[in-house]
Swiss-Prot record:
This is Lipoyl synthase. Pathway: Protein modification; protein lipoylation via endogenous pathway; protein N(6)-(lipoyl)lysine from octanoyl-[acyl-carrier-protein]: step 2/2. Belongs to the radical SAM superfamily. Lipoyl synthase family. It comes from Shewanella piezotolerans (strain WP3 / JCM 13877). [4Fe-4S] cluster 2 binds at C94, C98, C101. The keyword Signal does not apply. It holds the Pfam family LIAS_N. The gene is lipA. Residues 80-297 form the Radical SAM core domain. Keywords: 4Fe-4S, Cytoplasm, Iron, Iron-sulfur, Metal-binding, S-adenosyl-L-methionine, Transferase.
Length: 321
């Protein structure tokens, strides 16, 4: 059996090159076997792309990344047109290789020590009032990137004292207590960590992740910061049943998570995990009703919902679909 080639620093692996390195084989989808996308998932492009161009230029100017672009989010046009973006720190190369995700895999470069200041200035220039900061997984770092998150939060608040900051963090490779000790110095206004799918599908969809680690991360943060909302997101269409998702919702509530996002998985390319079903808006409404009935303070559930989609409105408890 041939060993995978040694990863070179800074080289992005995508699509077939990326998924070939995971333990579960993903067979490329043939066009005639792919499910037809229903009408409710058709995204209308805005008439003007000027605001989109401006935001992309602001990101490029300071060498920053948005998860909107790197993960091929279907809401990019809408969010950029409204002047919002989710910033992705610690580079654009992930040490994990989840076959549902379009972010590149590889051997990341050393974190940019100037990124926190560049990020803060960009946010000020864009006159943003609410930002989401996320990152790739950095299993190569002893703290999983926690210190870089804290540095970014500190610098953002120095230049933008009125801003609200939501962090969408990785699992820090199970180094939970160390990461939370660091984040306690500069906690966010909303703490988000996505479970992504039901535990039965972790080996297939999230190699390297651990369901209980993720739940423990959310619960331990809440124990330390009882007044800061905790949040998590899930995708549907990876082979899970509605009953499995319902159990995950109960698990989240048992770990004191208050906010939920639930959306449809969309296959980034034929080399990624296939969409096994398209969940109807009515089913999302049913799961939203369940979430609210078991105590979530806010649940954004719909085909195009993503964890940072209209995050400012989610944090205010407004309806998002």
């Amino acid at each position: 059996m041939n060993r995978p080639e040694r990863l070179q620093p800074g080289v992005k692996l995508r699509d077939a090159d990326k998924v070939s390195r995971i333990p579960v084989k993903v067979v490329p989808s043939e066009r005639d076997t792919m499910l037809r996308k229903p009408d409710w998932l058709r995204v209308k492009l805005p008439a003007s792309n000027q605001r989109i161009t401006e935001i992309k230029q602001a990101l490029r100017k300071n060498g920053l990344h948005s998860v909107c672009e790197e993960a091929s989010c279907p809401n990019l046009s809408e969010c950029f047109n409204h002047g919002t973006a989710t910033f992705m720190i610690l580079g654009a190369i992930c040490t994990r290789r989840c076959p549902f995700c379009d972010v590149a895999h590889g051997r990341p470069l050393k974190p940019d020590a100037e990124e926190p200041k560049k990020l803060a200035q960009t946010i000020k220039d864009m006159k943003l009032k609410y930002v989401v900061i996320t990152s790739v997984d950095r299993d190569d770092l002893r703290d999983g990137g926690a210190q870089h998150f804290a540095d970014c939060i500190r610098e953002i608040r120095l230049l933008n004292p009125e801003i609200k900051i939501e962090t969408l963090v990785p699992d820090f490779r199970g180094r939970i207590d160390k990461a939370l000790d660091i984040l306690a110095i500069e906690p966010p206004d909303v703490f988000n960590h996505n479970l992504e799918t039901a535990p039965m599908h972790y080996r297939k969809a999230r190699p390297g992740a651990n369901y209980q680690w993720s739940l423990d991360l959310l619960k331990k943060f809440k124990e330390r910061h009882p007044d800061i909302p905790t949040k998590s997101g899930l995708m549907m269409g990876l082979g899970e049943s509605n009953e499995e998702i319902a159990q995950v919702l109960h698990d989240l509530r048992a770990h004191d998570v208050e906010m939920l996002t639930l959306g449809q998985y969309l296959q980034p390319s034929k080399f990624h995990l296939p969409v096994e079903r398209y969940v109807s808006p009515a089913e999302f409404d049913e799961l939203k009703d369940l979430a609210e009935s078991i105590g979530f303070t806010h649940a954004a559930c719909g085909p195009l919902v993503r964890s940072s989609y209209h995050a400012d409105l989610q944090a205010q408890g407004k309806e998002v679909k």
